[in-house]
Amino acid sequence: MAAQGFLLIATFLLVLMVLARPLGSGLAWLINDIPLPGTTGVERVLFSALGVSNHEMNWKQYLCAILGLNMLGLAVLFFMLLGQHYLPLNPQQLPGLSWDLALNTAVSFVTNTNWQSYSGETTLSYFSQMAGLTVQNFLSAASGIAVIFALIRAFTRQSMSTLGNAWVDLLRITLWVLVPVALVIALFFIQQGALQNFLPYQAVNTVEGAQQLLPMGPVASQEAIKMLGTNGGGFFNANSSHPFENPTALTNFVQMLAIFLIPTALCFAFGEVTGDRRQGRMLLWAMSVIFVICVGVVMWAEVQGNPHLLALGADSSINMEGKESRFGVLVSSLFAVVTTAASCGAVIAMHDSFTALGGMVPMWLMQIGEVVFGGVGSGLYGMMLFVLLAVFIAGLMIGRTPEYLGKKIDVREMKLTALAILVTPTLVLMGAALAMMTDAGRSAMLNPGPHGFSEVLYAVSSAANNNGSAFAGLSANSPFWNCLLAFCMFVGRFGVIIPVMAIAGSLVSKKSQPASSGTLPTHGPLFVGLLIGTVLLVGALTFIPALALGPVAEYLS
């Protein structure tokens, strides 16, 4: 089984790198504000029709454009969900959502979290799924990519005040990256057997003679951007373990590739735009090392079997509880790490049924900020915060002013970096504490003891870091949990984007200094180790006490 696991990981990473490399070159064109071949005429017509100019924006204007678009999307989606029963494409006559669930869902999809306190097939109409959630899947992904575009430009430009035009970036990202790739993936899913229709739910007779109601809907089109945009919200409650969403082993492999495709391509693009491809490879090496170790730990933990079943004398050579037999332990373990290393949150197995250590690793990957490949855009700008922190620490050790890519990292940048890094840990720890201190929070726990606390900690970690996956033993559809998690999702998203954009605004105004004999190389194995150590150190110091009360205590009990 060890050989199978190694082959699975190696094949996945090899295919990923092959696909991401050319996409990274295309993204580099867009970052450099160069239209892709054959798109100039279309862009001219669209920009003219929409009133979009090529006038560049400073960081505040760029940020306001991103925030304005997202706030408008939040309001539209909120009222759409409230009035769902008045809108078309609702063959099941599903009612509108309660205000707290509508708020939670709207915030969830606008922030690229896709936390779901509802069951899609019994709660949302086709119109809400398509015009509401799927649209936000595109816009939230484009927003994250636009932010990293601005940050990369800040490193490559000198003595300037502008970072590009947010509207141009958003349109280009959506039209030339997200829509075409998602279309290809959706067509492949349809060919493999995923649903794509507007039929009412179908009553069928089973082999045993019972009657069953099969949900229908435009699944494949939402499934494609759900993965490509690292959104993660399933059309059905079972998410990607449902055969109508993920019908074959091949679609499952493509889904995992789609999750990491753009985050990996952005690393290649970063190297091209900065003029030093080693910088992009350095980031990929750091991410890949952490990723492979985490996959190995989860696979090892899950093939050991369930200790609780073993204690009862049951046969549990491997832990198959909560897993699809058509995928198995190794694929389920790989998918769990992929979906939590990125900000996706889609699942093919119930993370709540993983072993204590097997469930702790996905939780920890979210808690460190989902910087191991991470979400589209958000993963790379999150990792860049750790790069700046690592450069600062190295500068202190050698007694020189820290610099990265020729830009000096001063007090302002470090204050903003520290602020951005501290946002999500503060939300996670305070949110979990609030939930455990209140009756409304504790009443949602279906399990006592360390595992019950793990469910709470996982939920808040998932929301604050915009992942969206869950330990499903938590009954989160209540006003308390819907409001708490909506707050965590909102602040966890925009509370990081704001300081990141401020950092970009500060860096773009600086001149690049030529490298000297005292400059720390940031492209070699030494810096890779320093960066990994910084990520691990911050994650360990912040969350070890909380993890000790949850999964660690469960493992030792």
Curated annotation (Swiss-Prot):
Q: Does the keyword Phosphoprotein apply?
A: no
Molecular function terms in GO for this entry? Answer: P-type potassium transmembrane transporter activity; potassium ion binding
Q: Which InterPro entries match?
A: KdpA
Q: Which domain of life is it from?
A: Bacteria
Q: Where are the transmembrane segments?
A: 5-25, 63-83, 132-152, 170-190, 253-273, 283-303, 329-349, 356-376, 379-399, 416-436, 484-504, 526-546
Q: What's the subunit arrangement here?
A: The system is composed of three essential subunits: KdpA, KdpB and KdpC.
Main function: Part of the high-affinity ATP-driven potassium transport (or Kdp) system, which catalyzes the hydrolysis of ATP coupled with the electrogenic transport of potassium into the cytoplasm. This subunit binds the periplasmic potassium ions and delivers the ions to the membrane domain of KdpB through an intramembrane tunnel.
- Output this protein's name: Potassium-transporting ATPase potassium-binding subunit
